[in-house]
Swiss-Prot record:
Protein name per its UniProtKB record: Large ribosomal subunit protein uL30
SUPFAM superfamilies xref list: Ribosomal protein L30p/L7e (SSF55129)
Cellular component, GO annotation: cytosolic large ribosomal subunit
A Pfam family annotated for this UniProt entry: Ribosomal_L30
Alphabetical list of Gene3D superfamilies matching this protein: Ribosomal protein L30, ferredoxin-like fold domain
Amino acid sequence: MAKTIKVTQTRSSIARLPKHKATLKGLGLRNIRHTVELIDTPAIRGMINQVSYMVKVEE
């Protein structure tokens, strides 16, 4: 089974760069305190790094 990580949005996407809003949408995050469980891949890690100031990651 693939390793998964939990990603929680902690800050609003209002007044953020359009690229960062699109990244949150790509991660499946919709609003503050929304949590999704994702497969740990290099692509997902790159997306998380791009919006690291708006999300919290649990291994």
